[in-house]
Design a protein with these regions (language model features):
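Catalytic histidine neighborhood in serine/cysteine hydrolases
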Residues: 213, 217-234
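Active-site nucleophile loop of the alpha/beta-hydrolase fold
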Residues: 121-131
Length: 258
């Protein structure tokens, strides 16, 4: 588990969630950057309804106050995910992992670290390095003393839904996601044999859908794809959420029984 300690109270609805299932299978569900477990709660509850043991952790620095996130890095998030995975694997025969956005990045990381994972579900994952000019721009902002920029949360087509995410994006943690997390993973993608369900919103204003196109070509295991016409980045809370819940559980059932 991460050694990071958040100082602010957890926001209502941002709590982690754990469920004891009736089967021998487990599902680890992971939320995204500046978000919290609420964005993946529907996915988690769908797995629970299907009998799965479920772990839905709250990543360090998330779901409290953005000030808590400033000191967090990729290593803190992977430590929390690893702890949740181990809790599941101790009580389950097979485990699937599902993640949104950075949660998708952490899902890829888990599959690479644990090749015994039965399958993974990635929804609009951050999966590719940033362009050098973007990295240079953000590093320049940090050098000038800028720690945050306007938030990237709540990219949702449904006008009746708002993601419970931070209004700002912390730059140092963002750079850690890209440089410590995603960039070193890309050369490893081809080595994995873990089956993947890759869900991609055609209209994503946070993560370019091309990232998923590239991931599908790079990943060594079998890849099934679902393209969404109606939902934006936070698809797990958008118009296509029920279709995602159903597809994720159906995919998990298939790979676990194979």
């Amino acid at each position: 588990m991460s050694d990071h300690v958040d100082q602010s109270p957890v926001l209502p609805g941002a709590e982690p969630w754990s469920h004891a299932g009736t089967s021998a299978h487990g599902a680890l569900c992971i939320h995204g950057f500046t978000g919290n477990p609420s964005s993946m709660r529907g996915v988690a509850e769908a797995f629970a309804a299907a009998g799965y043991h479920v772990e839905l952790p709250r990543l360090p620095g998330h779901g409290t106050a953005v000030s808590d996130m400033l000191g967090t890095r990729w290593e803190h998030w992977t430590a929390e995910v690893e702890a949740a995975y181990l809790r599941l694997s101790q009580r389950c025969d097979r485990v699937v992992v599902a993640g949104l956005s950075m949660g998708g990045s952490l899902t890829l990381w888990t599959a690479l670290e644990h090749p015994e994972v039965a399958g993974i579900v990635c929804v609009n994952p951050v999966a590719q390095p940033q362009a050098p000019e973007v990295v240079e721009m953000v590093e320049g902002m940090i050098a000038e003393g800028v720690e945050m920029m306007p938030g990237i949360g709540s990219d949702i087509a449904d006008p009746d839904v708002v993601e419970n995410s931070y209004p700002e994006t912390p730059l140092r943690p963002l750079m850690s996601l890209v440089q410590d997390g995603v960039t070193p993973m890309v050369p490893r993608y081809g080595s994995s044999k873990v089956p993947m369900l890759l869900v991609t919103s055609k209209n994503d204003h946070v993560v370019d859908p091309i990232q998923s196109d590239q991931l599908a070509e790079q990943w060594g295991g079998p890849v099934e794809r679902i393209l969404l016409d109606r939902s934006y980045h936070v698809a797990t809370q958008d118009f296509d959420k029920e279709a995602i819940f159903e597809a994720a559980v159906a995919f998990a059932n298939r790979v676990i029984s194979s």
